[in-house]
Amino acid sequence: MTLFRRILVPLDGTPVDDAVLNHVIALAEAFHSEVILLRVAHFHTRDTMTHEVDDAQAVLDRVAPRLEGRGFAVRTVVGRGEPADDTVEQATKLDCDLIAMGTHGHGALKRVVFGSFAERVRHATDVPLLLVKANAGATAAGEVSPAVDA
């Protein structure tokens, strides 16, 4: 049995995506996981919907070849709506075993005022989370060693 059969990776199009992907590569190699890349198109009006969906797909189209080139099974999904809600919904719908995502490490005041994407996901799902800080630097894929209790 594979511990992480499917890893969901919500992308926000910022440099933290690279750090998250390095960790995901190591885990996917260790567990022969399918990687599901998610970009949520968050739009406020119908007029911006097509543009946001196209932008989301463009982000996925830039990232997927990096993983496919290493031989991973990769699926891309464009979500629609509120990013945290859609991430939780997709994780459940796609039967994911792990959500690997970046966190920008904003201060406590900003989290209280605006909320935190990672916090909202954490409170809304039972799927395990791997959180990678934006300022953690890009870890080489070979430097991540998953510890597993058998």
Region roles according to the model:
Residues 31-34, 72, 96, 127:
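Short glycine/serine/threonine/alanine-rich loop segments
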Residues 26, 90-140, 146-150:
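Gly/Ser-rich helix-loop-strand patches that form or flank binding pockets
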Residues 50-61:
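Short, surface-exposed alpha-helical segments at coil->helix boundaries
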Residues 1-2, 16, 65-99, 136-150:
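Structural beta-alpha unit
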Residues 47-52, 111-113:
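Short, solvent-exposed loop/turn segments at secondary-structure boundaries
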Residues 2-50, 149-150:
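Small/aliphatic-rich secondary-structure junction motif
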Residues 36, 75, 130:
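Conserved beta-strand positions in the Rossmann-like core of class I SAM-dependent methyltransferases
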